[in-house]
Amino acid sequence: MTRIIVVTSGKGGVGKTTSSAAIATGLAQKGKKTVVIDFDIGLRNLDLIMGCERRVVYDFINVIQGDARIQQALIKDKKTKNLFILPASQTRDKESLTYSGVEKVLNQLINMEFDFIICDSPAGIETGAILAIYFADEAIVTTNPEVSSVRDSDRILGIISSKSKRSEKNITPIKEYLLLTRYNPTRVKKGEMLSMKDVIEILRIPIIGVIPEDASVLRASNQGESIILDQNSNAGSAYFDTVNRLLGENHKFRFIEEEKKSFLRRLFGR
């Protein structure tokens, strides 16, 4: 059965699109037929992070409006087998997204036997975000360990619980997960960031992953590659752990404690 997962956040700049790309890529690496959809109409950043911006011919809105078939709009990833991207439109109005149109596209993807449909939602509560949430079976709420980000995530959780198709039909609610990004144990220790425990206590949803602050993320993004492809990076490893947990595997959380310096590093102040 196809799992529809929305990756969402209360505010921008928390690494939501990076997370969507990494999770989709990781699932495909595990042999799952996966498509990631960009719901951010007008901005379209997912194709840049996935390195396929020059291959966009048709987009999500073209399919909704009947200007293209789903097979024409889907972009097959060149680096990862089983992975497809459905880009957003850069030029169309956000109101071009409709409930019936999104449902039509999702049903077509389900009929194509995708294992996972990852919906990369815009931040906040605009049309794209509401529609990405509405049809989801599961939601990954992406947040930084900062008070403002966590507060906005709490608002998104309210929307997830009340504005979904599942809540309308009074069936099993959307399964919610917390993804904590840009986590820096040193800053947590100094009191400059909330701890993982603090965020869990505030939001009260299960945590699926903790992604450390890592310069490799920006480098990968600029190269048009998903960070999960860089397994030598801490962030890439943490995203892979997250994917494994999403598939039901148990993995200890890494990168949540300050790295202990060796004697020589302490001696030379490095």
Swiss-Prot record:
<feature type="binding site">
    <location>
        <begin position="11"/>
        <end position="18"/>
    </location>
    <ligand>
        <name>ATP</name>
    </ligand>
</feature>
<dbReference type="GO" id="GO:0051782">
    <property type="term" value="P:negative regulation of cell division"/>
</dbReference>
<dbReference type="InterPro" id="IPR025669">
    <property type="entry name" value="AAA_dom"/>
</dbReference>
<keyword id="KW-0472">Membrane</keyword>
<keyword id="KW-1003">Cell membrane</keyword>
<keyword id="KW-0131">Cell cycle</keyword>
<protein>
    <recommendedName>
        <fullName>Septum site-determining protein MinD</fullName>
    </recommendedName>
</protein>
<comment type="similarity">
    <text>Belongs to the ParA family. MinD subfamily.</text>
</comment>
<dbReference type="GO" id="GO:0016887">
    <property type="term" value="F:ATP hydrolysis activity"/>
</dbReference>
<dbReference type="InterPro" id="IPR010223">
    <property type="entry name" value="MinD"/>
</dbReference>
<dbReference type="GO" id="GO:0000917">
    <property type="term" value="P:division septum assembly"/>
</dbReference>
<keyword id="KW-0067">ATP-binding</keyword>
<keyword id="KW-0132">Cell division</keyword>
<dbReference type="GO" id="GO:0005829">
    <property type="term" value="C:cytosol"/>
</dbReference>
<keyword id="KW-0547">Nucleotide-binding</keyword>
<dbReference type="InterPro" id="IPR050625">
    <property type="entry name" value="ParA/MinD_ATPase"/>
</dbReference>
<comment type="subunit">
    <text>Interacts with MinC and FtsZ.</text>
</comment>
<dbReference type="InterPro" id="IPR027417">
    <property type="entry name" value="P-loop_NTPase"/>
</dbReference>
<comment type="function">
    <text>ATPase required for the correct placement of the division site. Cell division inhibitors MinC and MinD act in concert to form an inhibitor capable of blocking formation of the polar Z ring septums. Rapidly oscillates between the poles of the cell to destabilize FtsZ filaments that have formed before they mature into polar Z rings.</text>
</comment>
<dbReference type="InterPro" id="IPR025501">
    <property type="entry name" value="MinD_FleN"/>
</dbReference>
<keyword id="KW-0717">Septation</keyword>
<dbReference type="GO" id="GO:0005524">
    <property type="term" value="F:ATP binding"/>
</dbReference>
<dbReference type="GO" id="GO:0009898">
    <property type="term" value="C:cytoplasmic side of plasma membrane"/>
</dbReference>
<dbReference type="Pfam" id="PF13614">
    <property type="entry name" value="AAA_31"/>
</dbReference>
